[in-house]
Amino acid sequence: NLNINPYYDDFDKAKNFYKILFRPGHPVQARELTGLQSILQNQVESFGKHIFKEGSMVIPGGVEYDASYFSVKINPTHLGIDVSVYLNEIISNNSGKGTRVRGQTSGIVGTIKNFILPPTEGVDEITIFVKYNQSGTDGESVAFPNGEVLILEENLTYGNTTLNTNDTILTLVAENAAATGSAFGVSKGVYFMRGVFVDVPTSLIILEPYSDRPSYRVGFEVLEEVISASDDDSLYDNAKGFTNFAAPGADRFKISVKLAKKSLQDFNDTNFVELFRVRDGETKKLQNTSVYSEIKKYFAKRTFDESGNY
C-alpha cells in the first residue's frame, strides 16, 4: 500500500480511470506521476492474471531437489589459520564453480561447492558441501574419511595470499565427518508474483545438512521494500555526468525473492510462494513448469468441444 506519506498513491481501479490528463498551466502532482504508473501496472496485472497463476514460472530457469548433497565437517583451523577467512574464496573460485580438492590419504577428489558456519542450520561445526568427482585409490571409498587432510588440486588466492596446487588447505574432524545432506535450488528465471514479472536469480537453500530425508515446504519468500537514495547511490541525480549527492532522486519500489523453507504444518503464505514439498525425503509437489490461469480453462473447454471426454 503506497497511499501513505509521502507518496499518496490513491489509484482506485473501481473508478475506471485509465489516463491522467495533464493540463498546461497546472502543476504536476507527485501522486499523479505515481498514479500514472499504477494505472499501467493494473493493466499488466490484469493481463498477467489471465495467463498465469500467482507464483507461476514464466521463463523457466529450472528447479532441482538434490537428495545427495554431500556434507563434510571440518576443523575451524588449519596450520594455525582460521579457515573461515578463505571459505568464501573456495566456493567462488572458477567463477563460482568451486575448488577441487583431493584427500591426502584416500586420494578421493571432490569439488567444494558450499559451506555453512555454526550456528547456521543448527550445526556446531563448520560444514562444507562437496560434489565428489573421483573415488579413492582403493577403488571403493567414495567419501572423505574422518581426520582426512584436503589438498588443493588447483591454485587459490585469498587477499594477498596465493595457495598453490598440492598445498594442504582443510582438515576433517576426527569423528562422523562425512554425511549426506539435502538441498533445493532454482536457476535464473522469471516468475509472476504480486502482479509483476519478477526476475529470480540462481540460488540454493540447504534443507538438511546431515540428512537426506527432509520434510519441508520450500519456495520463495517475497520481499517488498521502498529504496531511497540513501540505500542506493545510483538514485542520486546524475544529469551532469556525475553523482550529485546533494540531489536525491525519486524512491523506487522493489520486489525481490529468496528461497525459504517452512514446516509442513506452516500455511501462513502471505509472503510465500510454494515451489516444492517433500516429506521424509519423498517429493510430494514440484512446480517446474508454468501454471496457467483463465487461458488454461479456455483451452480445456476447446479440447473438450473438439474431442470430448477422454
PLM regions: where:
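Subunit-assembly interface segments of extracellular/virion macromolecular structures
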Residues: 1-310
